[in-house]
Amino acid sequence: MIRDITLGQFYPGNSWVHRLDARVKIMVTLLYIVSIFVVKDFIGFALEALGLAVVIAISRVPLKFILRGLKPIFILIAFTFVINMFMIKGEVLVSFWIFSISREGLRMAIFMAIRLILLIIGSSLLTLTTKPVSLTDGMEALLSPFKRFGLPAHDLAMMMTIALRFIPTLLEETDKIMKAQMARGADFESGNILRRAKALIPILVPLFISAFRIAQDLAMAMEARCYGSNGKKTRMNGMKICSRDIVACLIFAAFLAMIILERILL
């Protein structure tokens, strides 16, 4: 399950989505996430899912690889579903003991589960189709207007990118530690949830040590390349909006307008 997390990973490719400007992809992803919380009915969610499916098809990232990222958050989705189903009051459909399931609660539970699934897939698609360097440059460019207020745009963008890239790195380290301890007789798969959680405690110390080691190696590599110097920073590849980026923006604007109209009219 640890290896199933796709957030923060990059899937190499040369598709139309891969070649889009990072700034465009970041803004489109943010607006798409906002639009997920705007829709209030099944038609809206169907449009959201259809738009995401089209982007996945164009990106040529295997659907199996993308759906694999949903496995680690299945418990969160199930927990959210159950909480919404039982906590929201309304017209009772089923009642047993002190629990009751309402029509409104079931509807909200389904909507929240769909929102989480679309949010995770949409966010993962950004990192899967954008190189880490391009992601950093895109974030810095979008944050650059705030420099006049003293915001260190470059450092903040670098921190966010490193945090994203550390997710698969730390998961890989966790997997290595678990396999090493399983080879020595550790059992992480038997017993109830509490017993499995307790079995993971011995992993924490070597994981923290490994994380500090990776962070130190990264810091030394950045210092060796004079990161943090006061000189003007340059890029090997400049960022430029081209025709395909404009077309992508127009298509997404039409999609967003359709979502808003559906929300208003239906």
Q: In which residue ranges do the predicted regions lie?
A:
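Alpha-helical transmembrane segments and their membrane-interface exit regions
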Residues: 51-61, 76-79
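Alpha-helical transmembrane segments and their helix-start/interface "positive-inside/aromatic belt" motifs
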Residues: 25, 64-74, 248
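Membrane-helix interfacial "entry" motifs
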Residues: 14, 37, 60-65, 96, ...
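Transmembrane alpha-helix interface motif
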Residues: 1-44, 48-57, 141-151, 155-158, ...
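Transmembrane helix-loop junctions in multipass membrane proteins, especially transporters and channels
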Residues: 41, 45, 60-64, 88-96, ...
